[in-house]
């Protein structure tokens, strides 16, 4: 039985050696995987930096475009305000024209008889002026004949009746 103890020691040493070899193989495999992960992370880090740069550039462009659009909107707002002011002015003008037209129509309808009388009197005044002109012209001619106002009125009446 003395021999069992050294054999057990040898078996234990061989088992320990196999265990160590197994652990070394696993550690080598893990190291390869970690190296692969490290390379992948380096690539991802480079891509993230590129994406970050592009995103920053895009944000700057968007900010510039936003400022440009805001400036144009501000300028356009002044144009819209001016057009609104013109529209308000035109609307006020239309209201004023409507009020004046209504006032004129109302005054004409109220003063229709007076206007008719004015027209009649103006016709009478024009007839008198024509008669005076005719009388003046006849006095200046060689066939001077003295007429009275009654003769002129009679002549005017006869000329209208004959027409």
From Swiss-Prot:
Pfam families: DUF948 (PF06103). Its main location: membrane. GO terms for cellular component: plasma membrane. It comes from the Bacteria. InterPro entries: UPF0478. It is found in: Cell membrane. Keywords: Cell membrane, Membrane, Transmembrane, Transmembrane helix. It is a single-pass membrane protein. The keyword Protein biosynthesis does not apply. The chain crosses the membrane at residues 7-27. Belongs to the UPF0478 family. PANTHER family: UPF0478 PROTEIN YTXG. This is UPF0478 protein SERP1299.
């Amino acid at each position: 039985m003395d021999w069992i103890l050294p054999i057990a020691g040898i078996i234990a040493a061989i088992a320990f050696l196999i265990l160590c070899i197994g652990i070394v193989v696993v550690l080598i495999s893990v190291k390869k995987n970690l190296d692969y992960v490290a390379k992948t992370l380096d690539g991802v880090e480079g891509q993230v930096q590129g994406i970050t740069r592009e995103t920053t550039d895009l944000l700057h462009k968007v900010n510039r475009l936003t400022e440009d659009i805001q400036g144009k909107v501000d300028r356009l707002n002044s144009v819209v305000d001016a057009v609104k002011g013109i529209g308000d002015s035109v609307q006020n003008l239309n209201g004023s024209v409507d009020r004046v037209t209504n006032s004129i129509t109302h005054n004409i309808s109220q003063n229709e008889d007076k206007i008719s009388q004015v027209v009649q009197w103006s016709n009478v005044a024009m007839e008198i002026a024509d008669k005076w002109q005719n009388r003046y012209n006849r006095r200046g001619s060689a066939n001077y004949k003295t007429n009275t106002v009654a003769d002129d009125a009679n002549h005017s009446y006869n000329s209208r009746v004959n027409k």
